[in-house]
Amino acid sequence: MLQNIFKRVIFMKRFFALTAALLFAVFCLSACSGGSAGGQGEISVFYYTFSDTYISGVRSSLDKILSDAGLSYNDYDANSSQTTQTEQVQTAIAKGASALVVNVVDTGSDDAAQNIINLASASNIPVIFFNRSVSESVIASYDKCVFVGTDYEMAGHMQGEMIGNYLLQNYDAYDLNGDGKISYVMFKGQEGNLEAIARTQYAVEDCNAVLEAAGKPAIEFYDAANANKYLVDQDGNWSSAAATNYMSTILARHSTANGNMVELVIANNDEMALGAVSALQSAGYNKGAGSVTIPVFGVDATDAAKAKIADGSMAGTIKQDGEGMAQAIKTIIDNFNAAQPPLTGIDAENTVGTQRVNVPYSAYTGE
């Protein structure tokens, strides 16, 4: 009798232990899974590099939004290597990723983005490209693909208009050698990148349109021998170091004392603008009262750029809303999870068709 009771007690203990273990396992699986039309698993977010200041801001915003929502995610740093990023995508898919959020490295051709779509579509996983340009034909090739970015041409237009109006406020003061024209240098972030191409072109064209409407001549690139009329980051990293090196070389030959000083600096992004400011300050410019200040303009409105605008060493920037970009990505992920059209709930003014979101720009001069 006692032996039978003992056996029953042992059985019940084992039963309850097994039940508890199963319930715990189910709880863990549900807590760790983001879930989506692409299957159970984490959201995999791929950045072209962690070292880009603007992208770091997007990453911080997206990490917080996903964490606050209780979604499981993993961030990948490609360190500017498309080969690395493609391998990371393959690994994430093999691990059962629920969605791929991709800041693609190679924007010079469609091959990289199309390859990622091919990998994702084979496993029915949604893809959200963001920030770095992907062609419309690539996006349209997969019905579970969305691009979150900007109307990339608009940044150049807005920057050019801002620069033109800024120069007109005190044109003679910015014309340091009194020749009636403003000389400039343009720092381009990357060859073959649609955003860099548009910013480089339209910043100058729209600035000239503003000046010429006011009866002023077009701005002139400081080096007549440079047919491109820009200096590009040869590594394609839009980096402050590239701009600092270029600007330091320029300042070794051009100065107010020589009467040939570069009178305006235009950069494709704030990192390059800040690099130019660093070189200028090392040469004694843009240091506040008592020093000559060269107007410097960027794009992104990073915290570092805002600080330089506040102290007067930088003139203005175009805000690219990283937090707004992160929120749009989260909304699209939710829509895929709920099997809704991906752009549901996003302001129609910021959408193009059914597969693109343009986060709006705004001018920032510290006012």
Residue ranges of each PLM-predicted region?
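Short, solvent-exposed amphipathic alpha-helices that sit
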Residues: 54-69, 155-159, 194-221, 225, ...
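Hydrophobic alpha-helical
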Residues: 102-122, 203, 227-306
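Flexible loop/hinge segments that line or gate small-molecule binding clefts
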Residues: 116-154, 158, 172-181, 187, ...
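Short beta-strand->loop
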Residues: 47, 148-150, 182-195, 233-236
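Extracytoplasmic "Venus flytrap"
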Residues: 42-61, 65-66, 73-90, 97, ...
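Short, low-complexity disordered leader/linker segments with a strong preference
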Residues: 1-42, 67-68, 72, 115-125, ...
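Hydrophobic alpha-helical segments within soluble ligand-binding/sensing domains
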Residues: 40, 85, 146-181, 198, ...
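Hinge/cleft segment of the Venus flytrap/periplasmic-binding protein
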Residues: 178-183, 187-191, 195, 207, ...
